[in-house]
Design a protein with these regions (language model features):
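Alpha-helix boundary/capping segments in eukaryotic regulatory proteins
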Residues: 147-151, 163-172, 184-192
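Conserved positions within tetratricopeptide repeat
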Residues: 153-154, 193-197, 219
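TPR/TPR-like (Sel1-like) alpha-helical repeat modules
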Residues: 189-207
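Short, charge-rich amphipathic alpha-helical segments embedded
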Residues: 154-176, 201-211
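N-terminal alpha-helical interaction modules that lie
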Residues: 1-150, 158-162, 206-254
Length: 254
């Protein structure tokens, strides 16, 4: 599912390595098996600012299951209690029991609201995408359009590894395009220019191309990236505020 607005089209913080691992282990499972999108639901709820505020001594199991039910149903999981036990077995570092209920595990508790926000957008990006041969491709597009460029890279990389010829080159260019926007989110101009140097040269004038998974329009994202590169090369210094006023780039499957 894609949204016009995204909290990620602005400068983003750096997560500590342990938080990056926490996010990535759950997200990679969701990419590997669509049914494992369920593992994004639990930290999303536990780290939610509203839950943390309303359940200061922990959210009771019964309430946790109620909160999870609709999100789980949207990814074809019908039994919240079974999903919760399955998640706890795989990821014992998600939650700890306190006085009356569950709280985020100490390993990510300090970052809970930000982790919940990112995981929530990961889940929203993957929800509504049918399992099938083009699952990863459609996930990559949705993630890109929601400003989750690092996750877009992770979705497209397996396709690139298995591709051949022109398709492999096209996928590599898409991955590098997404990687450049990821660097921009951290205001790393050198990183963006490095990965975009090859990608923008390869994609120059190619606003639409055909892959085995479908036809993709990327001209809007190419236009935005070109405007950003011009700003990065400005002799007057980089105006990051000007960059963040640009429209959020997007890809369109046609």
């Amino acid at each position: 599912m894609e949204y016009l607005n995204s909290p990620f089209w602005q400068r983003q913080p750096f997560f500590p390595l342990e938080i990056q691992r926490f996010l990535r282990t759950r997200f990679e499972k969701a990419l590997h098996d669509p049914l494992d999108r369920q593992h994004l639901v639990w930290p999303l709820i536990l780290g939610s600012p509203g839950i943390l505020k309303n359940f200061t001594k922990g959210i009771p199991t019964e309430e946790l299951l109620v909160q999870a039910a609709k999100m789980l149903a949207a990814v074809e999981i019908k039994e919240p209690s079974i999903s919760w036990h399955y998640h706890q077995e795989l990821f014992p570092d998600t939650a700890s029991m306190q006085e009356v209920g569950w709280v985020p595990h100490v390993s990510w508790r300090a970052w809970a609201p930000m982790v919940s926000l990112r995981i929530g957008w990961q889940l929203s990006s993957l929800t509504g995408i049918d399992p099938g041969v083009d699952y990863l491709f459609k996930c990559g597009i949705s993630l890109f359009n929601n400003g989750l460029y690092f996750e877009c890279h992770d979705a497209l990389e397996p396709l690139w590894l298995n591709a051949r010829g022109e398709e492999k080159a096209n996928l590599q260019s898409l991955i590098l395009l997404a990687a450049g926007f990821h660097h921009i989110q951290h205001q790393n101009s050198a990183g963006a220019q490095s990965v975009w140097k090859d990608a923008l040269t390869r994609l120059n004038g190619r606003g639409r191309f055909t892959l085995s998974m479908g036809k993709l329009e990327i001209d809007e994202s190419l236009r935005i990236s070109s405007l950003i590169v011009s700003e990065l090369d400005s002799v007057n210094g980089i105006d990051w505020g000007k960059i963040w006023q640009l429209p959020k780039p997007r890809w369109n499957l046609v």
